[in-house]
From Swiss-Prot:
Family, per entry: Belongs to the UMP kinase family. Highly divergent.
Protein name: Molybdenum storage protein subunit alpha
pH dependence (record): Optimum pH is 6.5 to 7.0. Above pH 7.1 molybdenum is released.
Induction (record text): Requires molybdenum.
Subunit structure: Octamer consisting of 4 alpha and 4 beta chains.
Cited InterPro entries: AceGlu_kinase-like_sf, Asp/Glu/Uridylate_kinase, MoSto_subunit_alpha/beta
Lineage: Bacteria, Pseudomonadati, Pseudomonadota, Gammaproteobacteria, Pseudomonadales
Domain of life: Bacteria
GO CC field: cytoplasm
The keyword Disulfide bond is annotated on this UniProt entry: no
Function: Intracellular storage of molybdenum. Binds polyoxomolybdates. Can bind at least 90 molybdenum atoms per protein molecule.
Keyword annotations: Cytoplasm, Metal-binding, Molybdenum, Storage protein
One Pfam assignment: AA_kinase
Length: 276
């Protein structure tokens, strides 16, 4: 038998013999942005609090989305809402770890997505699971103008254990997808006009001041409640494509349409991305 040991070809790569913790390996490309995979994509995250309101909120929003389809190709992502809060409460009482709570909440977001997709089914819109969004979104959006998915990132049992409540929820997941695809934009649709200095529906609503524009850095310093995930502010700091996110009131007809057309109708949150 011929000894072929010495004929094995070595892979010529600076990564082959180095630790991936060596920052010198990525320094030559550190200042370059990754390519935009889907630069025409608009990502719209529908908050669970909007879905919780039922037909009064959902039907006008569905009609607005239907009218937007000729203008944009959309990835519509849904949050979980009050049902996730209930499952968190039960799970915490039972002592479930954060990694067990995360997929439970994600399933509630998926239910909202199925509802929204059913309402838009006549337009060729369907619900797709995480693997399809990750690997086949382009082909789906070449066949139809929009798809619906869960906004929760699939951390599930890999969720960070530092908190009892899963920190990476719907807003964070929507942003991670939008930035990974190099989307044209991300609009977060909630039940408030945007970001306030205090909860506009809480006991301190009299002191709540509306913020038409702010930054992830400034919001991270605030201690009050926010209508978006705190973890969203962390991932914004290391974003590669999405320069700003707009939070708008989905209960006001026309706000989402205006936002997707580039109008300032809510709160603009600047990320850590520098303009190209």
């Amino acid at each position: 038998m011929t000894d072929t040991t010495n004929s094995i070809k070595h892979v010529i790569s600076p990564l082959a013999r180095q630790t991936l913790q060596d920052r010198d390996l990525t320094r030559p490309v550190a200042g370059k942005r990754p390519i935009r995979l889907l630069p025409w994509l608009q990502v719209v995250k529908i908050g669970g609090r909007v879905m919780d309101r039922g037909a009064d909120a959902i039907l006008p929003l569905v009609e607005e989305l239907r009218k937007l389809l000729p203008e944009h190709r959309l990835l519509i992502l849904t949050g979980a809402g009050v049902r996730a809060r209930h499952v968190f409460s039960v799970g915490l009482d039972l002592g479930l770890p954060v990694g067990s709570l995360a997929p439970l909440a994600a399933s509630e977001a998926g239910q909202n997505g199925h509802i929204l997709a059913a309402m838009l089914a006549s337009e060729g819109v369907s619900y797709v699971e995480h693997p399809t969004v990750a690997d086949q979104l382009a082909i789906h959006l070449s066949a139809t103008r929009a798809v619906v998915g869960s906004a929760f990132p699939p951390y599930h049992h890999h969720e960070f254990p530092g908190s009892r409540i899963p920190p990476h929820r719907a807003d964070t997941g929507a942003f991670l997808l939008a930035d990974a695809f190099g989307a044209a934009g991300l609009t977060i649709v909630e039940n408030v006009d945007g970001i306030y200095t205090a909860d506009p529906n809480g006991p301190d609503r009299g002191q709540a001041r509306f913020l038409p524009e702010t930054s992830a850095t400034d919001l991270a310093k605030s201690e009050g409640p926010l209508p978006v995930d705190r973890a969203l502010l962390d991932v914004m700091a290391t974003a590669r494509h999405i320069e700003r996110v707009q939070v708008v009131n989905g209960l006001v007809p026309g706000r989402l349409t205006a936002a997707l057309r580039g109008e300032h109708v809510g709160t603009l949150i600047r990320t850590g991305v520098r303009p190209a």
